[in-house]
Amino acid sequence: AIDPAQGGSPQDYFNTVLWTGNDADDRSISGVGFQPDWVWLKARNHTYNHYALDSVRGDDAILFPNLTDAEDTTDDTGFDSFDSDGFTISQVNGWEINDNGKTYVAWNWKAGGSGVSNTDGSITSTVSANADTGFSIVSYTGTGSDGSTVGHGLSSAPELAIIKGRDAGYPWMVMGYPTNTSFPNDGSFLTLSTTDAMGNGTGSEISLGSSTMTFVDAGGNICESSRDYIAYCFHSVDGYSKFGTYTGNDNADGPFVYTGFRPAFVMI
């Protein structure tokens, strides 16, 4: 649990910052409160893409959560560095992360730095993990072999894994914990980049219920041979995070979804 009485605070591991673009170069976005390991940012008043960067892939590698596009490693994307209290950005035409007058939001997570080698699975991975908050960033190269495993670095099995092929146009796969009957361990998935209902298909079956992720069906979406992938893994932590499902009731007074705390970030 994250317990303020013991010196811990949720804001030490997750925080949201807002800013208004000014076209400047080398602009420091501060107030995060820590050096972020995963930054997800978006213009709030424009249709610019979502941008996702992390400390494992580096500050020059951008993925787009609203697109299936491969990772872009263009030298100058406008995201300059991860800093001790946030990050530094510049306005670059075509990237638009500090466009004059545009309002922006960035969600920031703290993991475990740039990552270390993890050999818990049959695939060696690079993992940046924060065991206290149940969050890790996992980089690995696929094998194409059913039953391959990869370590995630967490103290409990992930309840949620968001996986993206970095070097090809694969969808963002959102995979749930297998014991959740609403999100079964049978290849079921959601995708960030579409409005599609839950899917189920070849190349997507994964088991999360152990110290490693097991690629039951190691297809292109999650473990194609010689392809590079990034996975963001989560499990619930009392007082900090909660993952699950709920059923709507088509009523203005909708269902109450208990988390045990007031959330700072909700993804539905």
Which functions belong to the PLM regions below?
Residues A1-I268:
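Surface-exposed molecular-recognition determinants
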